[in-house]
């Protein structure tokens, strides 16, 4: 039987790689992704300019925003990009560090795989190290008083210093803190801070960044439906609808056969009566403003205008929800079911202004707004987009601290403290596992090392003295000053990071490294059609998965 030709199990147009080749390929892909955004860490970080497929320009130093725009082929690189997105959604900050750490964890593992150490041994050491990293972090964390605004501004400032918005840091910190405190909502002892839904960022090009502010209420890009309606109302009574003030057409197509001329007049009269009834149901409650998600017919506008009611139509559902939270109104589906307690009376002012070429409706001075709008002004769209990304990060940091008021020192100090603890612990370990365990400590040093590199200081000299510093008693808050590249005590410098962000960064980085080390086989399949097309000179990537 030995002379027979081999049996092909896999289809001929699939490509298979296995063993060491796959592992080193995965590690190299992860290292490449980490190298792309290595220069984006710290206050002296560089920015990247990316062209998206539509020809738009993105200028940013936010790890997640950069990787979102990059097109990659390798599956391991795709999973690296995925973790930065997860980090952004979970805690909103630390997207750059998580990629750099994961890349470094894999990089130090390569040496052991070359020495024929089994990946499972490396993985089990990494898992042990992760548990110890988490316990060490909790040991060095300190509680924070969230009612102390100076401390809160300081924490947000640590996050903003590394961003493009750092020139206007005090303005940005105040905006982030005010916005998050405004949307904070406590119910049955449970805190809810939903920034995505209730803190909307509106960007209007023009003016200067210093004109940006937080509105105690909502701003929408809409004008009144009829030019003679009021555009300035104090203490407005607001009614919110999600139904249209138009004549309802039947669900399916209906034909009406008319035999007499009067019947046609009667049909038109019925339409008018229906709309009049809708408007009367609304007018009974004496509102000043009616806002609906659907359309308002000309006739309805006429009735509302005669009753001196301002109407705004086709408002987004998300905006309507925010207005409801801000002024205490309820969104009603049928005008005939409107009651007095559905009317929102919490707003202090409704005003429609023209900014540039467009009209904007401002519902502000709300008594107890649980929703807000951040109005950003700036020179160009690119700058505004970057400022918005930075603000989102700052708000997430603020939210994390309010939900879990624990802090750890920034500037690479926590990494060095954890690395020192792991190195000490590894001395008591026996067997092969101690080497990969110690390598995790070595991998953690990549954060302070990158900070030093990015501000152009001498890496070897500073890292050695930082290691020496951490061997002394009560020196776990010493780290790198990213501005000057010198060693400082983070307590004095006031650079703190939320514990939640650090924990998530470490967990995600180690889990990703473990996941990629577990892979020993990659089978990539292509559809036959795509291959045929590329042979004929068609689109090379058509039909490929």
Swiss-Prot record:
Chain positions with Phosphoserine modification: 11, 170, 243-244, 252
Catalytic activities: ATP + H2O = ADP + phosphate + H(+)
Entry-annotated residues carrying N6-acetyllysine: 222
Pfam families xref list: Cpn60_TCP1
This protein's record includes keyword ATP-binding: yes
N-terminal signal peptide: none
GO molecular function: ATP binding; ATP hydrolysis activity; ATP-dependent protein folding chaperone; protein folding chaperone; RNA binding; unfolded protein binding
Entry keywords, A to Z: Acetylation, ATP-binding, Chaperone, Cytoplasm, Disease variant, Disulfide bond, Hydrolase, Intellectual disability, Isopeptide bond, Nucleotide-binding, Phosphoprotein, Ubl conjugation
Record: residues binding ADP: 42, 94-97, 162-163, 411, 482-483, 497, 502
Modified residues (Phosphotyrosine): 247
GO biological process, one term: binding of sperm to zona pellucida
UniProt-listed Enzyme Commission number(s): 3.6.1.-
Spans annotated as Disordered: 1-24, 526-545
Residues with Phosphothreonine modification: 430, 459
Localization, UniProt: Cytoplasm
Highest taxon listed in the record's lineage: Eukaryota
Annotated CDD domains: TCP1_gamma
Family, as annotated: Belongs to the TCP-1 chaperonin family.
Function per UniProt: Component of the chaperonin-containing T-complex (TRiC), a molecular chaperone complex that assists the folding of actin, tubulin and other proteins upon ATP hydrolysis. The TRiC complex mediates the folding of WRAP53/TCAB1, thereby regulating telomere maintenance. As part of the TRiC complex may play a role in the assembly of BBSome, a complex involved in ciliogenesis regulating transports vesicles to the cilia.
Protein name: T-complex protein 1 subunit gamma
Organism of this sequence: Homo sapiens
Protein encoded by which gene: CCT3
